[in-house]
Amino acid sequence: MFTSYQGRSTVLHAVAFVLVALSFIFPVVLGTSALLPTWLSGIVSILVALAILVDAGHKAFAPSERPARGLRGLSALAALTALIGWICWLFIFNNFDAAGTTMYKIGTFTLGTSAVLNIFCAAIAFMDWRAGRVTPVKH
């Protein structure tokens, strides 16, 4: 599964979505506290988003990667929104005065957007992987 971009993308986006869901979406929907510590899930999510960006950018314009360019672009967009959202939320988490400000609105919007984009990217990559439309790693 990790020998193709689609396989790696499926796993990375699924992990990114689960982290956002456990520490941001479920607490809002269920009205409870975060199921993971915010600082831990924020730092891990930032690292996963950076891994997604590096993976999406690596050999993105090679001729053999032409079928996956749309997925790579969407992956990069999902990673950028996750980075912006988590940086805003980590700032808000460490600064109580920032709650309710523009940064709160930006962080909430971008984390919600990244959750939707991550689940879409994971689904698209998984369907491409299952259909056999993969771009194998060439050394």
Predicted regions and their residues:
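Juxtamembrane/interfacial segments around transmembrane helices
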Residues: M1, S64-L74, F93-T101, M127-R133
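Cytosolic juxtamembrane helix and N-cap/initiation of the first transmembrane helix
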Residues: M1-L22, F26, G132, P136
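Transmembrane alpha-helix entry/boundary detector in multi-pass membrane proteins
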Residues: R8-L12, P27-A49, L71-L74, I106-L111
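Hydrophobic alpha-helical transmembrane segments and adjacent interfacial helices
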Residues: A21-P27, T81-I92
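Interfacial non-cytosolic loop connecting adjacent transmembrane helices
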Residues: G31-L40, R66-P67, G85-L111
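Hydrophobic cores of alpha-helical transmembrane segments in multi-pass inner/ER membrane proteins
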Residues: L47-I52, T113-I124
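Loop-to-transmembrane helix junctions at the membrane interface
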Residues: I52-I84, L90
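Cytosolic juxtamembrane helix at the C-terminal end of the final transmembrane segment
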Residues: G57-R66, F120-H139
